[in-house]
Amino acid sequence: MQIKESKPLISIVIPTRNEEKRIGKLLRSIKEQTYKNYEILVGDSSDDKTPNICKKEGAKVFRAKRRGVSAGRNIALKHARGELVAFIDADVILTRRVFEAAVKALENKRTVGVMPLFKPIAGEIPKNKRPIIYFLNDLGNFLIKANGLGGFRVYGCVICRRKDVNKVGYFDEKMHISEDTDFYRRLSKYGKFKALDVYAYYSYRRFIEKGIPRTFLFYIKNALITAAFKKNQNELERIR
């Protein structure tokens, strides 16, 4: 939805691959935002009904030439017209005031990017795994509030200024993992990241599917390597 007013336009960039079971929840949560001046841009490499669902919900869909979240984000970003850009993963669900809070926080010119705190999507977590998942979620929120430790944060939803994004370019499409750490590390040269006092719901499906300890260590290791050594981890397993 886009309206003509003085409030800055937010270009919402969503990479998708076979997200037909989840993307509708994100798109509906976007429609329920208190802040209404936005456009939805999807970079898609799906084999399922994801692009059709997105189009029905009013999103503009662009076919990525290669698989990967970086390619999806980049093709959508090239079509973005907004003063602000919101990079959101397809399995995130927003609470109603995320964009409103982000626009206000970005009035501070020393803030380069903002992100909500996260809550797990409880319905997809087996009861016996809830304690460890909630512990990891609390750790992720701590890292967001602490402005990242070693460059590691939770990047499922980040809103920033387009002019700052233009300074750092695009996501590295050669990276299969930690491409977000690499991108936001470059962006952090121009200001601080700030935690918003609002929440979004985050999917821990990959932790559950692939094993919680293994997935946690996998993400941590590669995020820290990317942040510390500033180099691509091109040999990593592709997980998305």
Q: Residue locations for each model-derived region?
A:
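Acidic donor-binding/catalytic loop of UDP-sugar-dependent glycosyltransferases
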Residues: K49, A90-K104, R185
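Conserved donor NDP-sugar-binding/catalytic core segment of glycosyltransferases
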Residues: R97-N128
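A recurrent flexible, glycine/aromatic-enriched loop bordering the glycosyltransferase active site
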Residues: P120-K127, N141-C160
